[in-house]
Amino acid sequence: MEFGHVAERARQRALVRRGYDAISVAYRSDDGDAAAASAEDVSRYSGWVAELAGLLRPGARVVDLGCGAGIPATRELAGRGLQVLGVDFSAVQLHRAQRLVPAARFVQADMAALHLRPASTDAVAAFYSLIHVPLADQQALFPRIRDWLRPGGYFLAIVGAGQWTGTAPYLGADMFWDHASTGTYLDWLQAARLVPLWNRYIPEGNSGHTLVLAKAS
């Protein structure tokens, strides 16, 4: 599989950052509601977070990659007594997250360039954020996530269900997406010593994504 050049991938990531700076409130209200034009079912997050939290000890450390404005996922994680670090590269999203989820810590960073201590966290979550990262950077990120996790730690993420790359207007801003197939993601995870435990298709309107849980070996 061939990927775009470094400069092109940087341009694509910048497009996503500017896009979420522009559409932050349209994408997710302070009440946690999704945009009316979106097929996303925000109520699903509660169940996903509950499944992850049920695997962790009280007070476990969780990194929420691409946390956005912190709602609902970061807030749900923190509300279950977990120590949460939210990561997002949109300044607008992050400022809202700091206000809306004071129980969590936040850092403004591009997940593709994030540095964390090895074996410093019990779980990593990435809900609808990896799909905005160029595929070459997604693949390179999985071994780093494994490095951040303690042995036996968990990675829960929404990834693509089928291969697709594109840029299109979204809620009034240009946005970029990059999806591999579910099978490709499972291969990448396995190669990074993140053993897939299960994956589920999440239908959304006429399409959908895949939710996958993996465990650090």
Q: Which sequence ranges carry the predicted segments?
A:
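Short, glycine-/aromatic-enriched active-site segment of Class I SAM-dependent methyltransferases
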Residues: 160-176
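A conserved beta-strand element that flanks and buttresses the S-adenosyl-L-methionine
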Residues: 125-126
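Conserved class I S-adenosyl-L-methionine
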Residues: 2-57, 163
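A short glycine-rich, Lys/Arg-flanked "PGG" loop and its adjoining helix->strand segment in the class I
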Residues: 139-151
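Short alpha-helix
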Residues: 177-193
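Core SAM-dependent methyltransferase catalytic element
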Residues: 201-217
